[in-house]
Amino acid sequence: MPHLPLASFRPPFWGLRHSRGLPRFHSVSTQSEPHGSPISRRNREAKQKRLREKQATLEAEIAGESKSPAESIKAWRPKELVLYEIPTKPGEKKDVSGPLPPAYSPRYVEAAWYPWWVREGFFKPEYQARLPQATGETFSMCIPPPNVTGSLHIGHALTVAIQDALVRWHRMRGDQVLWVPGSDHAGIATQAVVEKQLWKERGVRRHELSREAFLREVWQWKEAKGGEICEQLRALGASLDWDRECFTMDVGSSVAVTEAFVRLYKAGLLYRNHQLVNWSCALRSAISDIEVENRPLPGHTQLRLPGCPTPVSFGLLFSVAFPVDGEPDAEVVVGTTRPETLPGDVAVAVHPDDSRYTHLHGRQLRHPLMGQPLPLITDYAVQPHVGTGAVKVTPAHSPADAEMGARHGLSPLNVIAEDGTMTSLCGDWLQGLHRFVAREKIMSVLSEWGLFRGLQNHPMVLPICSRSGDVIEYLLKNQWFVRCQEMGARAAKAVESGALELSPSFHQKNWQHWFSHIGDWCVSRQLWWGHQIPAYLVVEDHAQGEEDCWVVGRSEAEAREVAAELTGRPGAELTLERDPDVLDTWFSSALFPFSALGWPQETPDLARFYPLSLLETGSDLLLFWVGRMVMLGTQLTGQLPFSKVLLHPMVRDRQGRKMSKSLGNVLDPRDIISGVEMQVLQEKLRSGNLDPAELAIVAAAQKKDFPHGIPECGTDALRFTLCSHGVQAGDLHLSVSEVQSCRHFCNKIWNALRFILNALGEKFVPQPAEELSPSSPMDAWILSRLALAAQECERGFLTRELSLVTHALHHFWLHNLCDVYLEAVKPVLWHSPRPLGPPQVLFSCADLGLRLLAPLMPFLAEELWQRLPPRPGCPPAPSISVAPYPSACSLEHWRQPELERRFSRVQEVVQVLRALRATYQLTKARPRVLLQSSEPGDQGLFEAFLEPLGTLGYCGAVGLLPPGAAAPSGWAQAPLSDTAQVYMELQGLVDPQIQLPLLAARRYKLQKQLDSLTARTPSEGEAGTQRQQKLSSLQLELSKLDKAASHLRQLMDEPPAPGSPEL
């Protein structure tokens, strides 16, 4: 709505202050000095000086003299630390008798609380059973046991933040909670790290040590890293029951693993067989599917691999001619990405309907290297439109070829050894060569013999060992396998029937697909670190071709009894050799939900807390860990190990990249919590196990991502930020600046409590919450918002969507309590006599608000809650961690949705008032305000909130102008709606001669932005609505400036100067 013309304004309002019919003002505590006083003159002179300086700055920006963004970025430096320095023994309660420090300091807040929580037993279900709010219900979870290969990363912190928030909420609402801590021995990963460390520090290979000596080294590593992981979990505030801590290689776990193996074997679900497995030549062990990284290559790519002196080329298709036997000029050209496996070829296959090869069906080809005849076979698995339509068949080194070979009765030839060198079957000229060195030699010979037909780029997926970086080979090995079809079908049916709930539900599709295509699980690993397989070979002479005799037992004595039964010979006469291999780490991990509770013994914990109430973990572990827990748990205990699964997304950096050591973007939670400078980050890299080439790349990437280091953010800010990302969304893109912003939120809460404690005073006695009744509309509004926050938190926890909880808490603390109520109540608290209602409301907001916050920010909530005075009549809880969580129903009597709806109208007025002040640069003046509305109900609403309107709008007196009354002269006007206006006093508060050039400079700047946006071609992916919103916002701001300039010229009571720009 345009401003009214000059003629519509009345004379300066204060000249008619006592005239009949003029509005009455509700005065507030802030009043300006009379305009003629010396103080007023000095204030105006100072204000004019500031405005001149601001004008010069704007003009410099227009002239292009402003600093570039890079110049304005400051490096982070640790601030002066505020530390808790009162002598307190570990486990003693923190001394909170002193005043709160002036600013929030994470190190001060987080000191001393955790040891006290543990010593008091707050995290034990036995303690929780005695709480006044005890429900008699149980809630049990186990932490996904982190690998002892190193320290926790940000993905672990996300798991802890989500699980601990849920656990603390259940504990506060009165459930008996058991959250079991533990760590995983991580067989391949740990052995690889220790081997790398031994070589780096002492130049020793594993095979140069005895098995016992090497295992001592690994146990030393475990003790060091296991302790470090526990300290990290404590630093994150994880409320685990440490008396029940377990490790997947401790005695109890070993008993459970052996029992599970024996039971599965007796049930016919475990067998030994000779078949293809994923083989890491660098580790000399079979590995699980989860340890295989399927890396897509767009075409020719060179990779550095362990044991290779030079980079190896991949993403190439080599064409090789196989001569037709008996026809010197006939050949079949085969394309392959693995020419090093040519010595293992036993046939060439074509599609039976491919007319190009119909005349060769049943014919023999000649091996291009060995010269022996090879059959040309037909198989429907061949894709005739890929390459030449002819493929070589290598059953010993390809799963697809192994299936084809089995269909056609072809015997495999193993031409690659366990260490990645060529076997004797390749001939003397290749035996012992590294397979990729042999590749070059093979291609050279084929070229020399005229059988090489070309080379071309070929997109492919290359299987890489995630532990060693080596290319995976498929080798035929004698291994132990678990039959998964029957157990997998039960797991699939559990989800389909609803007995097992996966959340988010879109994971159900992957679950069903995986279990409908599941193969048998190879559980043998050629390692020293892990659970040695409880299977024994009966050593005896037998005829060529007879199978070995293997027996399984919980001990050698039991195995000997079984062997005696099988052979019919006395057990004492038999020689048994235990399988040196160990079990896949995922085997023991799959038992964790019940082995951690004492299975196979019938323990009280197993009876009370199994099945678990919830399994929460990363979505990347759905199939490899969750699926296997469901299979083995159902098979071994007769029931699902849990009925609900909550899966959180992967944590990625702000650019959307997976966090990886090789990219240098891994975030250590400790660095975010305590802060770290760049040189320290770089030193941590140098002290790790990266090789020099990797180190240089990673260090450069780290400098780019964190050029000024990482600022100190604190545990509570990190936890809150991680929980604020919804599990229903895609991957979590985390930036340090986001956590730092949450630290500022912590500071807001800190300052709010400092204000509230100061306002309450030492003699304040809180009322019981149920007796508190609001004494003003503002009190009623904030209590209603508090009740709404409790309702939203309860909904978020019940649905396990923690982003709803964080949003509700952030909105209440920041936008309702700090930004509105505390500001509005400040002048009220200094009234004389002091009203009784607001202090009680402030206390309830602090007490209940902190309890709502406690599951997500346990340290900050405890520190501040301990300083609140106790409510009379009942003993307070010793800790906020065991205080009752505010329930929505207990606060329902405070809910007033209609008041909240109407108060949003008041907030609209406040926004208009602040916008007017900003437009006219009224930085310190407190102008008077008039509100005019013909909307029914507005008059009564505004009258009820006159004082808060003046306080929140940074204005002086606020009055009501009757509908239809003439607008005052010399006042700025802004529309509130089609039926309501806001008027603000300007006469004597604004100097038009100073303000007009400032407005012109601001308009010039905005116009440049608008012109640039209009002329720019929309970028790919830029939403049309987003672009239109930017355009509309700039146009609106320009319109406001034009109206303000027009009104300032009217105040000057003279026409625009010739040649001045029209605004």
UniProtKB/Swiss-Prot annotation:
The keyword Aminoacyl-tRNA synthetase applies. It holds the Pfam family tRNA-synt_1. Signal peptide: none annotated. Residues 25-53 are annotated as: Disordered. Residues 42-53 have a biased composition (Basic and acidic residues). It comes from the Eukaryota. InterPro entries: aa-tRNA-synth_I_CS, aa-tRNA-synth_Ia, Anticodon_Ia_Val, M/V/L/I-tRNA-synth_anticd-bd, Rossmann-like_a/b/a_fold, tRNAsynth_Ia_anticodon-bd, Val/Leu/Ile-tRNA-synth_edit, Valyl-tRNA_ligase. It is found in: Mitochondrion. One of its GO terms (molecular function) is aminoacyl-tRNA deacylase activity. It catalyses: tRNA(Val) + L-valine + ATP = L-valyl-tRNA(Val) + AMP + diphosphate. Gene3D superfamilies: HUPs, Isoleucyl-tRNA Synthetase, Domain 1, Valyl/Leucyl/Isoleucyl-tRNA synthetase, editing domain. A motif ('HIGH' region) lies at residues 146-156. The keyword Transcription does not apply. ATP binds at K661. GO terms for cellular component: cytosol; mitochondrion. Belongs to the class-I aminoacyl-tRNA synthetase family. It is linked to Combined oxidative phosphorylation deficiency 20: A disorder due to mitochondrial respiratory chain complex defects. Clinical features are variable and include muscle weakness with hypotonia, central neurological disease with progressive external ophthalmoplegia, ptosis and ataxia, delayed psychomotor development, cardiomyopathy, abnormal liver function, facial dysmorphism, microcephaly and epilepsy. This is Valine--tRNA ligase, mitochondrial. It comes from Homo sapiens. The lineage of its organism: Eukaryota, Metazoa, Chordata, Craniata, Vertebrata. The gene is VARS2.
